[in-house]
Amino acid sequence: MNKIRILVCHLLYSIGCPLNRDQLIEITSLEQAVNYFDLMEALDGITGRLCTCQEVNGIPVYSNTRLGDAAAREFGSELPQSIREKMFEEAVKVYTRDE
């Protein structure tokens, strides 16, 4: 579960902009990298401390807190580089498509 939390913080830190729940689901489900229920549990576990969740037009949108950014910088390297790169590429695709 901690690796999923780190992955979410790393995604938000790397892309530099907030992502909504559906975007996070789509990005992390690439090649079934993260189970949906594990992602939901991880989001619940980091909301408030490592990231904030605000509703925009009724949609939950996540962004890192300072602690979330620090966690991404400090622990992001614990994630395999191939996973970080794939998730970042997918995040850019999803974010630019939806904006």
Which role fits each region the language model picked out?
Residues 66-98:
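Short, amphipathic alpha-helical interaction segments positioned at domain boundaries
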Residues 33-48:
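Short amphipathic alpha-helical interaction segments
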Residues 13-20, 34:
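Short capping segments at the starts of secondary-structure elements
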Residues 6-10, 26, 44:
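Contiguous, well-ordered alpha-helical segments that form the cores/surfaces of helical PPI scaffolds
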Residues 58-65:
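Minor-groove-contacting beta-hairpin "wing" of winged helix-turn-helix DNA-binding domains
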Residues 18-28:
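Short acidic, hydrophobic short linear motifs in intrinsically disordered regions
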Residues 1-15:
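Short alpha-helical segments that sit at the start of domains
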Residues 47-57:
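A short, conserved structural fragment
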